[in-house]
Amino acid sequence: MSAVLDKGSLVDVFSSPSVVFNQIREGYCAEFIVEPLRVGFGLTIGNAMRRVLLSSLSGFAISAVGIKGLTHEFSCIPGVREDFADLALNLKKVVLKSISGATCGNLHLSVTDGGAVFSNMISPSHDFEVVNGDLLICNVAEGVSLEMEMKVSSGFGYVSSVSVRKDEYDLEGAVPIDAIYNPVRAVNFTVKPTSAGSFAGHDKLILYVETNGAMDPKTAVLEASKILSTQARCFLNIADPEHRVHGVPCGVSTSDRNDASDLLSARIDRLYLSARARKCLNGENIVYIRDLVSRTEADLLKAPNFGRRSLEEVKKELFSKGLSLGMNLDSHG
């Protein structure tokens, strides 16, 4: 689409749109109405937000389970109606959120007299809260006891159990299960013509977001927006290439640079990493995020017990913060 602009009208054409938040179900569903947008920008922004919301937000999930007598995923569980495959499917649906800032930990479930076992029967934890307490986990025969230990880890998207090595978790005798970390369940959007005053004919973006309750839609959209903004900000360095720091969103203001410097000076505890990855990094004397981003992929893969899965975990977490491995930090002192 082309347009002839009068002098001084360029800024008006790309005026900042407004956002209206409509809550559909508190903590779970909401829609965001964005207008006015230049024609074509509704589709551009809608696609970008949808991709980030469905792929780049971190969350928590049960990634391994240990039951007395269980040695592999094909073992029978005495006194339990469900086989391990069905049990794993149910545990995959348990929604967790961190209440202490912890990025990993263990949960315990104990049943002494049989009956239906629900997720709200998981022992209370100082680190994690079960959001959907009404989820049926399994059915135990009368008079049969069941002891279950579950490993909780943080991550992105969906991780299959076959990609997890047994030495990547610290729960003895546990069997890994598929894990769904992303707190966003569904994202849809539509683009319509806006009727907002003088902007009639521009785009109106209606973004629908549904989460699992571990993160509310407003927070999810905010986090996704930060990720997109951080990644796009790298192009601002084109105007001042001599002061570019590889991978660091220098931005255009002193406050932006200070924010980046503060993040680099933070300890790696601020990152959502598994216990295994964190232990490997500590073994390499990597204490601060600055130490981590100055290493290359090859450097990390040389560390004992640090494999490709741990590497991808680190890269995704750094990406969500606008950082990357192999950064040149000379200009940060």
UniProtKB/Swiss-Prot annotation:
Molecular-function GO term, any one: protein dimerization activity
Enzyme Commission code: 2.7.7.6
Chain spans, region Alpha C-terminal domain (alpha-CTD): 259-333
BP terms from Gene Ontology: DNA-templated transcription
Organism in which the protein naturally occurs: Neorickettsia sennetsu (strain ATCC VR-367 / Miyayama) (Ehrlichia sennetsu)
Enzyme class: transferase
Keywords: DNA-directed RNA polymerase, Nucleotidyltransferase, Transcription, Transferase
Subunit: Homodimer. The RNAP catalytic core consists of 2 alpha, 1 beta, 1 beta' and 1 omega subunit. When a sigma factor is associated with the core the holoenzyme is formed, which can initiate transcription.
Pfam families assigned to the protein according to its UniProt record, in alphabetical order: RNA_pol_A_bac, RNA_pol_A_CTD, RNA_pol_L
Family as reported in the entry's similarity comment: Belongs to the RNA polymerase alpha chain family.
Reactions it catalyzes: RNA(n) + a ribonucleoside 5'-triphosphate = RNA(n+1) + diphosphate
Chain spans, region Alpha N-terminal domain (alpha-NTD): 1-239
Domain of life: Bacteria
Protein name, entry field: DNA-directed RNA polymerase subunit alpha
GO cellular component annotations of the record: cytoplasm; DNA-directed RNA polymerase complex
Alphabetized InterPro entries for the sequence: DNA-dir_RNA_pol_insert, DNA-dir_RNA_pol_RpoA/D/Rpb3, DNA-dir_RpoA, RBP11-like, RNAP_asu_C, RNApol_insert_sf
UniProt xrefs under NCBIfam families: PRK05182.1-2 (NF003513), PRK05182.2-5 (NF003519), rpoA (TIGR02027)
Domain writeup: The N-terminal domain is essential for RNAP assembly and basal transcription, whereas the C-terminal domain is involved in interaction with transcriptional regulators and with upstream promoter elements.
Described function: DNA-dependent RNA polymerase catalyzes the transcription of DNA into RNA using the four ribonucleoside triphosphates as substrates.
